[in-house]
């Protein structure tokens, strides 16, 4: 099914009223709704417009327990860079099921150049009502190519946000593209990331970092050598399908499902893969390729959604290369 005829980096959730809601970047941030579990979709509505030579990119969305919908996104200024336009994280809120949206809300700014920017926000609500946004952050590393995963907290449903703290960093490398979940045990936060620091891989590999809900990242960050940093795939059942852009979700019965992009068995182009993990988000296996494409076609910046009674929806940005 086509959700957006143009754009990329799409994510889907199921709302409390049963509808599906999708978001993507396409000359700003667009949303669409489906009332029939994805068979048909409403015409896209643009809720964030690009201004001041600053594209808004890579959105994520969440519905809070109180019904508020939040879309987070990433302003990425275009060249020529100016110090007044920084790479940042922003969000908008809707309290009427997506009909109207708040003004833009500031979360974080990195630096004003591409090499020291921030990227790819993704949100998680905790049982306490605390809302977290995780993102890839080069802002602290102005003298190197390193990158960490940072996280900001909101205690008022996304209206205001605290300062960032690092939750994972492998010295000399680039932890990126976080996708957080709370496991079914309601005791463990797991964040899927891309990690290009595994010895011998010379590429990104889908990885998890984790923390107890009790600790909740307070004065705690996962280092490159930490026992709380794990490769995702079980190589007894899966090939070494290196790649990045992971996305992680929890199934109703506790198992976990991961997507990522890889050139494995796909020539020089990238496609989408998924695998199923256990209730601890470990030992991912049953690897599959949701979109069967020619090796000349790309499926990138993908995600998975879990809807209805546990249906897994693969969401891919397809590009036919001419």
Where are these regions (language model features)?
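Asp-box/BNR beta-propeller blade signature and adjacent active/binding-site loops
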Residues: 1-322
């Amino acid at each position: 099914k086509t959700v957006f005829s143009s754009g990329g980096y799409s994510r889907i959730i199921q709302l409390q009223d049963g509808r599906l809601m999708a978001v993507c970047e396409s000359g700003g941030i667009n949303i669409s709704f489906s009332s029939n579990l994805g068979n048909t979709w409403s015409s896209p509505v643009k809720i964030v417009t690009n201004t001041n030579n600053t594209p808004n990119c890579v959105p994520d969305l969440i519905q809070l327990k109180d019904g508020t919908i939040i879309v987070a996104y990433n302003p990425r200024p275009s060249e020529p860079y100016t110090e007044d336009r920084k790479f940042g994280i922003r969000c908008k809120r809707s309290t009427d099921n997506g009909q109207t949206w708040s003004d833009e809300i500031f979360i974080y700014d990195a630096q004003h150049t591409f090499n020291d920017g921030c990227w790819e926000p993704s949100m998680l609500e905790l049982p306490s009502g605390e809302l977290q946004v995780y993102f890839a952050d080069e802002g602290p590393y102005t003298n190197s190519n390193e990158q960490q995963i940072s996280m900001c907290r909101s205690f008022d449903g996304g209206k205001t946000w605290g300062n960032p703290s690092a939750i994972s960093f492998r010295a000399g490398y680039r932890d990126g593209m976080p996708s957080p979940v709370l496991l079914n045990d309601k005791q463990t936060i797991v964040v899927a990331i891309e990690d290009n620091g595994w010895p011998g891989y010379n590429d990104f590999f889908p990885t998890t970092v984790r923390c107890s809900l009790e600790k909740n990242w307070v004065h705690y960050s996962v280092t490159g050598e930490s026992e709380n940093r794990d490769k995702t795939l079980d190589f007894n059942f899966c090939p070494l399908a290196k790649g990045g852009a992971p996305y992680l979700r929890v199934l109703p019965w506790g198992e976990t499902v991961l997507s990522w992009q890889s050139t494995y068995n796909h020539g020089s182009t990238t496609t989408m893969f998924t695998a199923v993990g256990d209730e601890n988000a470990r030992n991912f296996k049953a690897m599959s390729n949701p979109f069967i494409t020619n090796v000349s076609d790309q499926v990138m910046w993908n995600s998975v959604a879990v809807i209805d009674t546990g249906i897994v929806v693969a969401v891919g940005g397809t590009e036919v290369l001419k």
